[in-house]
Amino acid sequence: MGILGIIVEYNPFHNGHLYHLQTSKELTKCDYTIAVMSGNFVQRGEPAIVDKWKRTQMALKAGIDLVIELPVVYATSTAENFAYGAVKLLDSLKIVDCFSFGSEKGDLNELTKIAEILLEEPIYYRKALKEYLKSGITFAKARELALQKVINNNEIEKILQTSNNILAIEYLKSLKKIGSSITPFTIKRKGSLYTSLELKGEFASASSIRKHIFEKGLEGLEKYIPDFTKEILQSSFEKKQGPVSLEEFSNILIYLLRNHIPLNHIFDVSEGLENKIYKASYKTNNVEELMKLVKSKRYTESRIRHILIHLLLNIDKQIFKEFDGPNYIRVLGFNEKGKEMLREIKKKSPLPIITKVSQYKEKLSNTKMFEKDLFATDVYTLAYKNSSIAGLDFIHPLIKL
């Protein structure tokens, strides 16, 4: 029985995701599928539009057999940390044969070549990088030019400018770094770019779908999302549990910043950026506006988003030194095939499986990472318009199909 692993966010699940899932199954000829999925906060540095259990329902209805949560410390981090945490978790299951991911490039050999150079940093690459850095350009631009020089490929700039290619390269780096035996596959992304905000083409991006939902609701999305996604979103919105956006947390974040809660313990914060964020918090009470005030050529919006989310969730950079990847397997949902795989994982994986949250202290010698997931849910539910009770992880049932 071939087992396929994929890394997802499904924020929300749309037809492009369905295409990737079905094509991955055909390409790898795997009979079973495991998804490692971001929880209530995602890699863009913002809350998911609906909670992790609603998105697990979408995944299972689409044909995923087992959904495992990616710890929030990795789910909300840089592309490099996100990829490493997710790949390490997939590999730690010890049953995954194939791993399929989307990319704009769609060429595994080309992406692997780039990943190997970035991971191994051969002397000729380091020399070129050093030369370009001396000229005063940014590290990202220097890296791009150095790669272009050593690989002799004029498309490097184009490859490194798109989010799925960047993640694909990080996935391949992580597989190589941990010496994984999982076989990678990439599928060329179809339709709009991940960051596109326009609803158009055969497959619309998740960003454009979210924008449409916040501005106009669910009407007009039938062409871009499966019926089950629409039904799950509709039910969630009727219960006032979404759509959730970063703006819901504006007051909390502005309060923390005006109170000068230290930022220097957060990953990727420099002194100049810290002061700029503090100053901006006195000029607005809206987090989206704050990011526009801080954003510059040097400080990208993505970097600022990640800092704000880590401030909101109290995630400090020390946690990345304490752990080398996730130290548990948190199950969110499964079907009958998923149940079979869980039995195999229990036999083969060195990590404890958590299906009953109340038992986490007995199962984990270090509970810090898991408790961040619990806290993230408690923060997330503050955005609900009706009830914002804490401790939802302890009482929400597993999603079973």
Curated annotation (Swiss-Prot):
It catalyses: cytidine(34) in elongator tRNA(Met) + acetate + ATP = N(4)-acetylcytidine(34) in elongator tRNA(Met) + AMP + diphosphate. ATP binds at residues 7-20, 102, 164, 189. Disulfide bonds: none annotated. Its EC number is 6.3.4.-. GO terms for molecular function: ATP binding; ligase activity, forming carbon-nitrogen bonds; tRNA binding. Its main location: cytoplasm. Gene3D superfamilies: HUPs. It is an enzyme of class 6 (ligase). InterPro entries: Rossmann-like_a/b/a_fold, tRNA(Met)_cyd_acetate_ligase. GO terms for biological process: tRNA modification. It is found in: Cytoplasm. Keywords: ATP-binding, Cytoplasm, Ligase, Nucleotide-binding, RNA-binding, tRNA processing, tRNA-binding. One of its GO terms (cellular component) is cytoplasm. Catalyzes the formation of N(4)-acetylcytidine (ac(4)C) at the wobble position of elongator tRNA(Met), using acetate and ATP as substrates. First activates an acetate ion to form acetyladenylate (Ac-AMP) and then transfers the acetyl group to tRNA to form ac(4)C34. NCBIfam families: PRK13670.1. Belongs to the TmcAL family. This is tRNA(Met) cytidine acetate ligase. It comes from Thermoanaerobacter pseudethanolicus (strain ATCC 33223 / 39E).
